[in-house]
A protein has these predicted regions:
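GHKL/Bergerat-fold ATPase module
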Residues: 1-232
Length: 232
């Protein structure tokens, strides 16, 4: 990558964006056939509904992806709708609706601050983590999303965007956390106490969500039974 610079003359390909009122347009020319092939591969991967890129981007409103071939292209629009289901200190459960009405139940949990600082300190002392990781000690969260209907055959790890197919996700869902990864953010780095803590937090969050779900159901049934008994 090179440092972007403003241009004096607006390229013809950018003019339609200006007419639509867009303020910032970044145009990256592809230098050769290999670069074009790689860009096409990444575009196909990005728009693969098997691992929706927009799932954990909670500030996202809408993304339109248009792949033009021979001057023609059909836009694909990606949106994200959130419906809160349950909120408790350090935990929230939401229903996420994506394009094509794909619905998922998402559980998001805060990482315990004391355990986070301890894991980061260990990682800094042993080498994998740098000083910049300290900021996550009080703000790290993990999320796991599962389809509202049939479960996935295989899960996928995310670091905000989908990682590669390896390593294997421990749940049949989509799992997002600020993992320590390689530079490409596609594979896990070596085993670290930090990554282990994030996975433990996911397991604890799922357990808590199940207890809350069925605990509420049992409480409601008990209340209904008491009301029925009282009526007799």
């Amino acid at each position: 990558l090179k440092v972007p610079v403003p241009v004096d003359d607006v390229p013809a390909a950018v003019v339609p964006f200006r007419r639509r009122g867009l303020v910032t347009v970044v145009r990256l020319p592809l230098r050769n056939a290999d670069a074009r092939q790689e860009a096409s591969r990444q575009l196909r991967e990005l728009t693969d509904d098997g691992a929706p890129f927009e799932l954990f981007l909670d500030r996202l409103g809408k993304v339109t992806v248009t792949h033009r071939v021979g001057g023609r292209g059909r836009p694909s629009v990606y949106t994200r709708k959130v419906d809160p289901l349950f909120t408790a200190p350090g935990l929230k459960i939401q229903q996420i609706t994506l394009r094509r009405r794909m619905r998922l139940i998402m559980v998001t949990a805060a990482v315990h601050s004391e355990r986070a600082h301890e894991a980061i300190a260990v990682g800094r002392e042993s080498g994998p983590l740098t000083d910049g990781w300290q900021a996550l000690g009080d703000s790290a969260v993990v999320s796991v999303a599962v389809p509202a209907g049939e479960p996935l055959e295989r899960g996928r790890l995310y670091t905000f965007l989908p990682m590669g197919a390896q390593p294997t996700c421990p749940v049949r869902g989509f799992l997002n956390a600020p993992f320590h990864t390689d530079v490409s953010r596609r594979t896990m780095a070596e085993s670290t106490q930090w990554n282990d803590l994030l996975l433990d937090t996911v397991a604890e969050a799922c357990t808590q969500a199940v207890v809350l779900r069925y605990g509420c159901t049992c409480h409601q049934r008990s209340a209904a039974a008491r009301a029925t008994s009282a009526s007799y």
